[in-house]
Amino acid sequence: MIIKYPDGSQKEYESGVKVSQITGDISEGLLRQSLGAVVNGEILGLDDKVYEDSDFKVVKFEDKEGKQIFWHTASHIMAYAIQELYPDTKFAIGPSTETGFYYDLDLEHRFVEEDFKAIEDKMKEIAKEDLPVEKIEISREEALKYFKEKGQDYKVELIEDLPADEKITMYKIGDFLDLCKGPHLLSTKKIKAIKLLSIAGAYWRGDSNNKMLQRLYGIAFEKQSQLEEYITRREEAEKRDHRKLGKELDLFSMHEEGPGFPFFHPNGMILRNNLLNWWRGVLEENGYGEILTPIILNEALWHRSGHWDHYKDNMYFTKIDEGDYAVKPMNCPGSILVYNSNNHSYRDLPIRLAEYGIVHRHELSGALHGLFRVRTFTQDDAHVYCLFSQVKDEVFKMIDLADYLYSTFGFKYSIELSTRPDDYMGELDAWNLAEKSLKEALEEKNLPYTINEGDGAFYGPKIDFHLEDAIGRTWQCGTIQLDFQLPENFDLTYVDENGERQRPVMLHRALLGSVERFMGILIEHFAGKFPLWLSPVQVEVIPVSDKFKDFAESIADKLHAAGLRVHLDGRAEKVGYKIREAQVKKINYMLVIGEKEETSGKLSVRKRNGEEVQDVDVDEFIASLKEEIKNKTITD
């Protein structure tokens, strides 16, 4: 078999060679650092074997796949420690996540943070022993017998739900044996730093009809210094938590009367409307027409589009005049109906249709998280209908739009190309052509990208944009998707130069993504200190006493007349208190108005960062703020 490496080189091996041998043949140093490999898009551990021609990429801890292996093993070590300390525990599931790992546990003892140290100490003890992590393949009957004897009901249920011919794998660390597909580290010794983070409730299988389990979250690293750096970042992230700042800045709230459905307050609507109005203008300048399509559409539409098979478990349904309808989880079919409502010539293409469409998806209650994970959100979708010869140019334009959007907010970004998933729709040749087109577009733009095997949409491959925020976290936001399938499903056509009907190509594009989620990211990225153009209140006017209130009002009125968002704090409170409160609200500028200001007609300006400027002309102050707004300047 042939093993192909990322640099294009290749080597021949006998079938059945271990990942560790292939890695070691590259270099012994690399083997010492490696945690596994991505083989034909699948993550394998060092002890796993390769049986066929493969694309082979070694992964280390800094790679997301490496972290997945590392943290998965850490979750098993945590479970082993808990088995030692609380022998009656029943274990549910314990995966790695993007930010660490957790294990869902069923036991009488209710965990509190004071329990964490004993568990951490036991985990460190296990890790230090350099125990091998052994993969064991057994029959379904043996696995059921083992877990029934142990009283591990959740594992029994998981096995019984597997297909009859499913291969059962277990992993063993010391005296702890767990049902698991893996992959894992070779041994426990690489895990040098461990911290338990929190405890939460989680229904078994996410179903509120099932028992509430205890979910214990943790993190682990190769070095203590990495853990210390993580703790610092986590503390900063907690200060920036958009749920906390959303309340402090009076932007939005969540209520038990509508879990997962955000309520935006006036301040939040100013932020939202300024963001969307600006983006609307950008899209108009770039040749997009805006549409609005219904929230509720006939159920048959979702069968035709293919969304039914992929989204039905997360959709909301209703009946209208005895007909079956669904609340839309996606905007694409509505856009398609708009396109199909007219005849089109090749001269009309490309047609660019943008929509700020409200979609609904049923998320499990345990998955809801502020604005990041909601049940209703506005998606800044656009769909471009074009000739195949226009695809590359349209993708170029979309990439340029993405760059303009993200750089406006000071985000750095990386790009992933996500390829054909297992549940893809359509013909393989069309998929290969679509993937090739997106690759060529990225390469002609000289943009570095990584391949995310098997993570494309069911109807086409996609380019994903991952933003890096002010404290180094990454967020997947924008996406560009190439689709040959939905035009086929909906019989989309245009008339070519010969008068023949032809099929257009459809490009899906969302760059903000979920507007609510993007707002949450902005809140945390800026820590609530928004650029002036987005700030709900741009200037706070603070008279030092009632004596100067009239002059302060005249200044506030002049600023307001100039189009600035101004608040006059005329309360009978001490000036220092009012300044501190304005700082807590993260208002960009504070104007303290007293005798000197009234006499001179000049302003004393205090910036959000504490910098003070005296004797500022009112008109010059207004002009400088207008310039800051126009340039979308990022301060602080």
Task: For the regions a language model picked out, list residue spans one by one.
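NTP/phosphate- and nucleic-acid-binding module
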Residues: M1-A92, T97-D636
